[in-house]
Amino acid sequence: REQISGLAVRFTEASRAYLMGVGTTFYVANISQYFFSNLADRYYPAVSSDEFSVVKVDSGDLVMALSQSGETYDTKTALGYAKTSGAQTAAVVNVMGSAISMMVDQVIMQGSGPEICVVSTKAALAQTFIMLRVALELGLMRGCLSQDVYKKHQQDLESFPEMIQQI
């Protein structure tokens, strides 16, 4: 929870924040923008990594990247642009020691194991849950969620593996 809370604090301190990914991780970023809007009353737009160079970022901003491999070319390039612009950077990645994990200010390792096929279902689901947890934490910090509602969501997340097993 400490890493999740730390990332939520970065969102509270940022004047603007962007969620970024490409391909499957862009879909995770899209879903996540609704988590933040609905749970923390903050809208952070999802931007595709390959289009991020048109976004104006500065030192008060946070750029949150999502990458399964941690080596995604467009995402690395976009993070380089963000860092050059002075923005804070964070990422959720699946591969420890990857380029993206080394270049950001804060990294959360998702630990979902290797993807065996092109479809990144396991990694995408893990990243979605991490972003949901960050949005919940931010919602609690900002007073948008009561402690009871927060705990209920946490319990639901903890019971998810059992629900999957039943399917």
Residue ranges of each PLM-predicted region?
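A short, well-structured juxtamembrane/interface segment
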Residues: 1-13, 167
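Glycine-rich phosphate-binding loops that contact phosphosugars or nucleotide phosphates
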Residues: 12-159
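Accessory alpha-helical/coil subdomains and C-terminal extensions
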Residues: 159-167
